[in-house]
């Protein structure tokens, strides 16, 4: 597979065209950002850790019947992925209260949420990813009603799979975001990534934060903690 021109450069990943029009290369960089890019640092090995972690999780989801974009690891920091027409919203599920939910609603951090809360956010850094709902998505043509329903169903399916996976490894899946796209056949497919950059994970016993909040809050040992998460899941890095 031949890497060609850069298609898109995000805060922590770069996407490249390939010589196959249906395939892209997803490159995980060491860049680490928070607060819509206001805080940025380079963390050694982070690109490698996130690339391999993402491949591990996406493989678990494929085994559970969730179609994903990831095809193969092709280097320590790169994966071959299917080309998708990405839907410009994030699907967020919250199992415990944390982050922006606590700030918005004034609730206590760590409150169990039953049922889990589902939220949509528009992917727009300039607007700080505002919350939107089904009506916004339909009115602005970002997705159809059928696609909205499919994204919700898949997001909750992912929740069932990954809550159990992390629970068995002594961790709580507090919340996470997913992004979906449409493949060449019109199917909704899970894209982007699932890494500790895009979810919150706490140790079940101590409530130690094991995700990008370590970077946001200056807790240190970011990559070391990501590696600990991976190793608890049985992924040797």
Curated annotation (Swiss-Prot):
EC number: 6.3.2.6
Matches recorded under Pfam families: SAICAR_synt (PF01259)
Annotated pathway: Purine metabolism; IMP biosynthesis via de novo pathway; 5-amino-1-(5-phospho-D-ribosyl)imidazole-4-carboxamide from 5-amino-1-(5-phospho-D-ribosyl)imidazole-4-carboxylate: step 1/2
GO term, biological process aspect, one: cobalamin biosynthetic process
Gene3D superfamilies: ATP-grasp fold, B domain, Phosphorylase Kinase, domain 1
SUPFAM superfamilies named in the record: SAICAR synthase-like
Reactions the enzyme catalyzes: 5-amino-1-(5-phospho-D-ribosyl)imidazole-4-carboxylate + L-aspartate + ATP = (2S)-2-[5-amino-1-(5-phospho-beta-D-ribosyl)imidazole-4-carboxamido]succinate + ADP + phosphate + 2 H(+)
Top EC group: ligase
InterPro entries named in the record: SAICAR_synt/ADE2_N, SAICAR_synt_PurC, SAICAR_synth, SAICAR_synthetase, SAICAR_synthetase_CS
Keywords, alphabetical: ATP-binding, Ligase, Nucleotide-binding, Purine biosynthesis
Family according to the record: Belongs to the SAICAR synthetase family.
Protein name: Phosphoribosylaminoimidazole-succinocarboxamide synthase
Gene name tied to this protein: purC
